[in-house]
Amino acid sequence: MRKNEKRNGKALLPIVVFVVLYLGLGILFEYGLDIEMGFYKIPVVVIFLVALLVACIQNRELKLNDKLEVMGIGISDPNIITMIIIFMLSGIFVGIVGRTSANSVAYFILSLVPPQFAVVVLFVVSCFVSLAMGTSVGTITLIVPIGVAVARVSGFALPVCIGSVMSGAMFGDNLSFISDTTIAACNGQGCEMKDKFKENFFIALPAAIASIVILLVLSVKNYNGGFIEEKYDLIQTVPYILVLIGGIIGFNVFFVLITGILSGSVIMIATGMIAPTDLIGNMGTGAAGMFETSMVAILVAAICALIKEYGGFSALLYWIKKVFKGKKGGLLGMGLLVGLMDIATANNTVAIVMANPIAKEMSKDYGISARKAASILDTFSCIFKGILPYGAQMLVAVSAAASLGEVVSAFDILPMLLYPYMLLLSSLVFISTMKVTDGRQ
């Protein structure tokens, strides 16, 4: 198949179409037509399908069969397959344990700490779990149901609880040694993981501390004392405890989720909470709840494969390299580069992989060390991916909440994503105060 290596900014049109339709319809529904939860009413799969059709119509020099082959290669990426399997397993897990188990976990956690600090606990627990598991999506899958239950019983707004979970998940995703983003950034830039971790740590730690302080202030100001202590069944907390321990230890996310599924099934049947036939039905219902999320991942992969084939990403990379000058400018350029890739691909690992070659070339041109380049790529991919309304993290969080009977919009959660915003501020301070020397930094 013929490769199109030329730079073609018009190839980015599908992304523009998606953003215009998604935001435009959302604003129209929410504010123009005054539809409750207007953004949540938007069929995101249909919007992505329209964007895919636009991508297919472009570049008439390429035959349809060749375009289908390009899309097939993009969809078959191991990261996409892994993501979809995680989606399915997480849906099955939620379908099995349901609301009752999540509520028991929430009451148990709140019995250990003052209820006004429950949101801070959600953030810290998510940090540790994500750091150990190396996956923000897996962490969100495990902790969001607990956050939903905490919101129900503590009086805190649901977006605050979910935002705290997502923030903590992005902390670990950025720093974990076993995170796909860490592996991709270090391998692409040619540095040791421990060196990248040291660079990252001094950017991430101030952001995490600032997030905790803000959450503490919000907790004290907004807690209304509405928590009513209720009884909880410790046996129902076992599936969540097992997956939490597995995550903290650092077991593979597949193993952790399968453990939760098996333990939840045994406990639900043994305690008479559900009949075996109903359990199987709940598994199917839970998996079905993740179908839309999985379809989004597939469509995004197909769209991005075509954009890359047409030369859209090459044009984007060329523009960034041309605009930013100097070492500090080079670091900012790297950050914007991977951020734009994140916006375009909705996959931070893919964004880093795509940005790696040009970032490595920029490192040579600007005299930037491999460990610093890897740190910036991973950090900014975390920032942008953490706040994407159509990213996997947000989609999983919203889907998990919906599967538990709670309707929440991505735009309700966005203002509560404190850590990505603090991480952006910390990164900008780090770059602006960096001492510039003639050596390689």
Segments from the language model and where they lie:
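Transmembrane alpha-helix interface/packing and boundary motifs in multi-pass membrane proteins
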Residues: 124-136, 167-173, 245-251, 303-305, ...
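Core transmembrane alpha-helical segments of multi-pass membrane transporters/permeases
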Residues: 41-49, 56-58, 67-101, 116, ...
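C-terminal transmembrane helix pair
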Residues: 181, 188-209, 327-441
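Membrane-interfacial loop-to-helix junctions in multi-pass transporters
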Residues: 76-83, 107-125, 151-161, 230-238, ...
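Hydrophobic mid-bilayer segments of alpha-helices in multi-pass membrane transport proteins
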Residues: 10-24, 34, 38-60, 81-89, ...
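Interfacial loop-to-helix junctions that mark the boundaries of transmembrane helices
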Residues: 4-7, 30-45, 73-78, 109-114, ...
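Long, contiguous bundles of hydrophobic transmembrane helices that form the permeation core
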Residues: 1-26, 58, 62, 66, ...
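Hydrophobic alpha-helical transmembrane segments of multi-pass integral membrane proteins
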Residues: 83-94, 114-146, 321-360, 365-366, ...
